[in-house]
């Protein structure tokens, strides 16, 4: 922890550091710290820190600042469900949240990285590009995530979803760096991943004896919130930025007056990330026991009260993804997520199952990780997609499909993963919308891939069930160790939503240790309720 801050173009830029952290910044680990003596009487004036002095310039800008790539190839509707390969629900839940992170997904769909990637082996950005492209262009299907996504992390048992999330983001961050060239640590803070998820804390200590002020700046990638005494995310944020009194045994050793004196320490956000990851600290560090309590979180969150500069307008974030853990310990249970598609509809992503849900249901969960995006960023990327989804003549996809497919295959060797067979790559390159997809189903009812079934007796009269294709995506060639994990459909028992699904794909066993005996259909059912 502790990369220097950057001063570019008259504006401070603080980005993520090389070592991930979720805790409150500690001044002892920060490199940027400036103190100043009062210009007049110690009792009558306060001197601010000038952070512009002695900062190293950026030798190389690894990604354009301020403006992230936009892509018009992103479908507005929800994409594919993900196959559980045995205790991989934590991976699936994390990947779904990243897939629906607009700045990241649009960058992946633009294929900017893979067109210039020179790594001899697969990198995480190329692997994520293939996954996101495949997932977003496979509505109504269940796909199997590449094993490369969890390479070096998955050990065949339940893992913590937050740890895997940060593992993936950190791997993407490293993939942004040129592997064969030396890059200074200032330039590392200019990567695209930093620009999406990175921000910076300011820890300001004020000596109550000489009134000197010391500012320490500490980059962050996610924000951990203590919820022991908080009933809402706003209360947890207020506690986080509440001034801390340093006196008695915790008195401050002032570097200005050279005395051990009482002081106050105030933590604020100096710069806020485009995408904000809030982690609710539900698990103990030692035993892993879970704090199961309801913590309220809003659909729209104003972060301005927690910023260093208070003279600007509201800084509004909108919720777009929620990670949920069901269980009593981080060592067992089940992970699933809720995501907001480009169309504005919320969906529950539970491994292979993708179900329409309401915002009321989303806000009533015992959330573990919350994903917010700046409202301006959401609107900017949404407008780009809306402009790119112009009507196309039927069959237009067929005329340019070969060109797009060849372009995708030439991008990078990682995009030619075994599970990305010709049929799936062909699907991944099509630009589709939910309305267009429904229209195609009406025109091709004789095709076995999709069936729009009649309303079942157990569903509301205005519900629509879209059944899973008979094609088993990603399951054509099973690994030997996976063969023993296939379940017998006749022994499958499910409750609630699972009882309404009538697909034909078998799922893999062992989403978690605790739920190892509970089987799950590997079809992908889309339930639309008004």
From Swiss-Prot:
GO MF term (any one): cysteine-type deubiquitinase activity
Positions of region (Disordered): 382-412, 491-524
One GO term (biological process): regulation of apoptotic process
Gene3D superfamilies referenced in this protein's UniProt entry, alphabetically: Cysteine proteinases
Biased composition (Polar residues): 498-510
Domain of life: Eukaryota
Catalytic site: 89, 334
Cross-referenced CDD domains: Peptidase_C19E
InterPro entries: Papain-like_cys_pep_sf, Peptidase_C19, Peptidase_C19_UCH, USP_CS, USP_dom
Extent of Basic and acidic residues compositional bias: 382-392, 398-412
Primary localization class, coarse: nucleus
Family recorded in the similarity comment: Belongs to the peptidase C19 family. USP17 subfamily.
Task performed by this protein: Deubiquitinating enzyme that removes conjugated ubiquitin from specific proteins to regulate different cellular processes that may include cell proliferation, progression through the cell cycle, apoptosis, cell migration, and the cellular response to viral infection.
Designated name of the protein: Ubiquitin carboxyl-terminal hydrolase 17-like protein 3
Lineage summary: Eukaryota, Metazoa, Chordata, Craniata, Vertebrata
Gene: USP17L3
């Amino acid at each position: 922890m502790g990369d220097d801050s950057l001063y570019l173009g008259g504006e401070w830029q603080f980005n993520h550091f090389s070592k991930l952290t979720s805790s409150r910044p500690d001044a002892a680990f920060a490199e940027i710290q400036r103190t100043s003596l009062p210009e007049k009487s110690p009792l009558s004036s306060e001197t601010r820190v000038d952070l512009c002095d002695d900062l190293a310039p950026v030798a190389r800008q690894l990604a354009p600042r301020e403006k992230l790539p936009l892509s018009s190839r992103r479908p507005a509707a929800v994409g594919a469900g993900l196959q559980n390969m045995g205790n991989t629900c934590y991976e699936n839940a994390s990947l779904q949240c990243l897939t629906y992170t607009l700045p990241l997904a649009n960058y992946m769909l633009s294929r900017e990285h893979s067109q210039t990637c020179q790594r001899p082996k697969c990198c995480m950005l190329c692997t994520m590009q293939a996954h996101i492209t495949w997932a977003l262009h496979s509505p109504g299907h269940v796909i199997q995530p590449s094993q490369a996504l969890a390479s070096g992390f998955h050990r065949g048992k339940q893992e913590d979803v937050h740890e895997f999330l940060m593992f993936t983001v950190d791997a993407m961050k490293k993939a942004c760096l040129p592997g064969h060239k030396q890059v200074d640590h200032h330039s590392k803070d200019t990567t695209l991943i930093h620009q999406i998820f990175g921000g910076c804390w300011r820890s300001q200590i004020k000596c109550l004896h000489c009134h000197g002020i010391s500012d320490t700046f500490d980059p962050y990638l996610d924000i951990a919130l203590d919820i022991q005494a908080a009933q809402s995310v706003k209360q947890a944020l207020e506690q986080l930025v509440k001034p801390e009194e340093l006196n008695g045994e915790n008195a401050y050793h002032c570097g200005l007056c050279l005395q051990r004196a009482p002081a106050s320490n105030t933590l604020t956000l100096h710069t806020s990330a485009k995408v904000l990851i809030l982690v609710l600290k539900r698990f103990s560090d030692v035993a892993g026991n879970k704090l199961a309590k309801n913590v309220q979180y809003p659909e729209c969150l104003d972060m301005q009260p927690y910023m260093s500069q208070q003279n600007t307008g509201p800084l509004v974030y909108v919720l777009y993804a929620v990670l949920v853990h069901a269980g009593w310990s981080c060592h067992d249970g089940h992970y699933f997520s809720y995501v907001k598609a480009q169309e504005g509809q919320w969906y529950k992503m539970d491994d292979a199952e993708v179900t329409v849900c309401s915002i009321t249901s989303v806000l009533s969960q015992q959330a573990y990780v919350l994903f917010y995006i700046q409202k301006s960023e959401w609107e900017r990327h949404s407008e780009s997609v809306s402009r790119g989804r112009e009507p196309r003549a039927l069959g237009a996809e067929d005329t340019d499909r070969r060109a797009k497919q060849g372009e995708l295959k030439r991008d990078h060797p990682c995009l030619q993963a075994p599970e990305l067979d010709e049929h799936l790559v062909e699907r991944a390159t099509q630009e589709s919308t939910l309305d267009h997809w429904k229209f195609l189903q009406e025109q091709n009812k004789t095709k076995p891939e999709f069936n729009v079934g009649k309303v079942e007796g157990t569903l509301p009269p205005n519900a629509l069930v879209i059944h899973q294709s008979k094609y088993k995506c990603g399951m054509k060639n099973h690994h030997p160790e996976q063969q023993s994990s296939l379940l017998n459909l006749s022994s499958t028992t499910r409750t609630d939503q699972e009882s309404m699904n009538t697909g034909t794909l078998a799922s893999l066993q062992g989403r978690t240790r605790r739920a190892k005996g509970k089987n799950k259909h590997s079809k992908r059912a889309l339930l639309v309720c008004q």
